Design a protein with these regions (language model features):
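Conserved anion-binding
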Residues: 43, 51-139, 148-153
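Glycine-rich, proline-tolerant flexible connector loops at the mouths of alpha/beta enzymes
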Residues: 1-12, 146-169
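Hydrophobic faces of well-ordered beta-strands that scaffold small-molecule active sites
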Residues: 26-33, 56-58, 119-123, 144-146, ...
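Anion (oxyanion) recognition and catalysis
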Residues: 179, 183, 202
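Active-site-proximal loop/turn and secondary-structure-junction residues that shape catalytic pockets
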Residues: 1, 34-36, 60-62, 123-127, ...
Length: 230
């Protein structure tokens, strides 16, 4: 849970900050455990936002209700959410702003066009796919993602000799199902791309990407910029 890892994360953030990093130059997007209740979302999201993160990634999302719990937890109670007004923490320090300015900026984009918090919602199960249109329709999602790696396991079977066999057609169908929901409800769609597939994924309509580490990751970034004319 968040309690077990928060101290380690804060120590890492402090080291980054001591080296000159801020939310403007080095924004953090952190991964949440699966949301099981509104109460969990309110408590654990507030704890992470209070450290100065700029985004929260919600994994294994399977219903619109979970999304609403998650997004409400990213908004102050005074803005209609469930984030306690007291949960400012040390966020203003990492953002490099006053507490008053942090409170103004720390709202959820795109519900607040000037908000500087963003949510990532990941669909990576059959149940999530069955509900993906309802999920995508919830206002306030920053980026909706198919959990491509997890979905590979979902659409794989194990042969008699123990070899894992992927149903490529079903897996790709799941990826496209999430993309279609994004397009229908005008939500940015993300994908974990590499140099071999970023061009086709951009052509399909994916607009947000995560890449791997090292030279291969940087090569993918450069290729993506070139393809986008940047």
């Amino acid at each position: 849970g968040v309690d077990e890892i928060l101290d380690a994360f804060v120590a890492f953030r402090d080291a980054m900050h001591a080296g000159g990093a801020t939310a403007r130059t080095h924004p953090f997007v952190v991964k949440m455990a699966k949301i099981e209740s509104a109460e969990q979302a309110t408590r654990e999201v507030a704890m992470q936002l209070a450290t100065g993160v700029s985004g929260v990634m919600f994994v294994e999302v399977e219903s619109a209700e979970e999304v609403r719990w998650a997004l409400d937890a990213m908004r102050w109670t005074s803005d209609g959410g469930t984030r306690p007004e007291s949960s400012v923490g040390t966020a203003p320090e990492y953002w490099g702003v006053s507490e008053a300015e942090y409170r103004e900026r720390a709202d959820l984009w795109p519900l607040d066009p000037g908000g500087e918090l963003v949510s990532w919602v990941i669909v990576e199960s059959r149940e999530g796919l069955a509900n993906v249109r309802e999920i995508a329709a919830v206002p306030g999602i920053g980026v909706l993602w198919p959990g491509a790696g997890t979905l590979r396991r979902v659409f794989s079977t194990v042969s008699d000799d123990g070899t894992r066999v992927l149903d490529e057609e079903a897996w790709e169908g799941a990826i496209q199902q999430v993309l279609a929901a994004c397009k229908e409800f005008d939500v940015a769609c993300g994908y974990p791309a590499n140099a071999s597939d970023i061009e086709v994924r951009m052509e399909q309509g994916f607009s947000v990407f995560v890449m791997g580490w090292g030279d291969a990751g940087f090569a993918t970034v450069e290729l993506g910029r070139e393809l986008a004319g940047r």
